């Protein structure tokens, strides 16, 4: 397999948090690649350590300059097999890896995928909502006013909507979403999850107003937010979470 991928950039999906979800092909590529490019030093080091792989690697993240991206692109096309991983899930989706992909393609290099977990797909699949059509919005603006405008625009077609947010901003975003839904007179159901695949995973399905009642009690975590299609409603509230947070005993698993 390595010979067949000489000179290629392979985007390798890693787990969303549970290392048990890593595929055998991903392990093989991580172990035998000539060049490895990660997103953050600590996360990539932890991944390699969990696999008992000792390997040096380069970084491509939000701090990587355009000049450094060009340099990495040249390294890829001049090397053997290069693997790109992100901190979680599939690289190239809402992370700086997409810039490297574009650079490699501009230089005539090959880009291939070793697919696996992806957070928005996992959340959408367990939401219970209709999945066709859906709109993936990535991360919204940091500014509340701009964010509300974005939410209004994404919700207008009536599709199922999926977006990411940071652990530090998701509570403000959910409150903005509530304001937009009230302003537009829509009563759409949501699916909200934190820390997918981990023991601390938290899920909520139902009306956003019900989630807001307990929002301040929720911990920091990596969220995915799914809004149902316009005609799809859920009147029944449903919470679920892992066993390691006894303070949430009232939430049903």
From Swiss-Prot:
Q: Which domain of life is it from?
A: Bacteria
**Compartment(s):** Cytoplasm
Q: Where is the composition biased (Basic and acidic residues)?
A: 230-246
Which species is the source of this protein? Answer: Leptospira borgpetersenii serovar Hardjo-bovis (strain L550)
Taxonomically, what lineage is the organism?
A: Bacteria, Pseudomonadati, Spirochaetota, Spirochaetia, Leptospirales
For this chain, the family text in UniProt reads: Belongs to the methyltransferase superfamily. RsmI family.
- Which molecular-function annotations from GO does this UniProt entry contain? rRNA (cytosine-2'-O-)-methyltransferase activity
Q: What protein does this entry describe?
A: Ribosomal RNA small subunit methyltransferase I
UniProt gene name:
rsmI
Q: List membrane-spanning regions.
A: none
EC nos = 2.1.1.198
Catalytic activities = cytidine(1402) in 16S rRNA + S-adenosyl-L-methionine = 2'-O-methylcytidine(1402) in 16S rRNA + S-adenosyl-L-homocysteine + H(+)
């Amino acid at each position: 397999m390595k010979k067949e991928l000489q000179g290629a950039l392979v985007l390798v999906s890693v787990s969303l948090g549970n290392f048990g979800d890593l595929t055998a092909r991903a392990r093989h590529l991580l172990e035998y690649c000539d060049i490895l490019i990660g997103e953050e030093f600590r996360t990539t080091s932890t991944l390699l350590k969990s696999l008992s792989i000792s390997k040096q690697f380069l970084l491509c993240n939000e701090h990587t300059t355009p000049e450094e991206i060009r340099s990495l692109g040249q390294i890829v096309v001049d090397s053997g097999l290069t693997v790109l991983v992100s901190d979680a899930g599939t690289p190239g989706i809402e992370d700086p890896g997409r810039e490297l992909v574009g650079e490699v393609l501009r230089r005539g290099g090959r880009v291939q995928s070793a697919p696996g977990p992806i957070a928005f797909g996992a959340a959408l699949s367990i939401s219970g909502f209709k999945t066709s059509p859906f709109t993936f919005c990535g991360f919204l603006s940091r500014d509340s006013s701009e964010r509300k405008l974005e939410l209004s625009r994404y919700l207008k077609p009536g599709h199922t909507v999926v977006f990411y947010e940071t652990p530090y901003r998701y509570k403000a975003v959910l409150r903005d979403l509530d304001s937009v839904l009230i302003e537009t007179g829509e009563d759409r159901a949501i699916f909200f999850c934190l820390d997918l695949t981990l023991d601390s995973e938290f899920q909520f399905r139902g009306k956003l107003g019900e989630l807001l009642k307990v929002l301040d009690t929720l911990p920091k975590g990596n969220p995915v937010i799914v809004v149902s299609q316009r005609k799809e409603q859920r009147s029944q509230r449903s919470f679920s979470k892992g066993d390691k947070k006894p303070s949430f005993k009232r939430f049903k698993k």
